[in-house]
From Swiss-Prot:
GO terms for molecular function: serine-type endopeptidase inhibitor activity. InterPro entries: Kazal_dom_sf. This is Greglin. Serine protease inhibitor. Inhibits porcine pancreatic elastase with a Ki of 58.3 nM, human neutrophil elastase with a Ki of 3.6 nM, cathepsin G with a Ki of 153.5 nM, chymotrypsin with a Ki of 26.7 nM and subtilisin with a Ki of 0.68 nM. Does not inhibit neutrophil protease 3 or pancreatic trypsin. No decrease in activity observed after incubating at pH 2.5, pH 7.4 and at pH 11.0 for 1 hour to overnight. Thermostable. No decrease in activity was observed after heating for 1 hour at up to 95 degrees Celsius. Disulfide bonds join C21-C55, C25-C48, C33-C69, C53-C76. The modification Phosphoserine is found at S8, S11, S15. Keywords: Disulfide bond, Phosphoprotein, Protease inhibitor, Serine protease inhibitor. It comes from Schistocerca gregaria (Desert locust).
Length: 83
């Protein structure tokens, strides 16, 4: 059979649903840029902050090289998930 469940995903798109969500991130300045499905860019202080946002807000994103980053905000788009 072709589909044995071990195929790796083709895209780099990620969303994190691990529980509990990371609540505290290290105070490390290692900026990462991501792009969401609306082609909006976000610049986060570090990868942990991206994962925290992804987990808490259901934020789906793709990592983008810094030189291609057109980020206008560094805030997590919390409003994407209605609680």
């Amino acid at each position: 059979s072709e589909d044995d469940g071990s195929a790796s995903p083709e895209s780099q798109e990620m969303s994190y649903t691990e529980l509990p969500c990371p609540s505290i991130c290290p105070l490390i300045y290692a900026p990462v840029c991501v792009e969401d499905s609306n082609q909006d860019f976000y610049l986060f202080v570090n990868e942990c902050e991206v994962r925290k946002c992804g987990c808490e807000a259901g934020f789906v994103y793709t990592f983008v090289p810094r030189e291609m980053c057109k980020a206008t905000t560094s805030l997590c788009p919390m409003q994407t998930k209605s609680s």
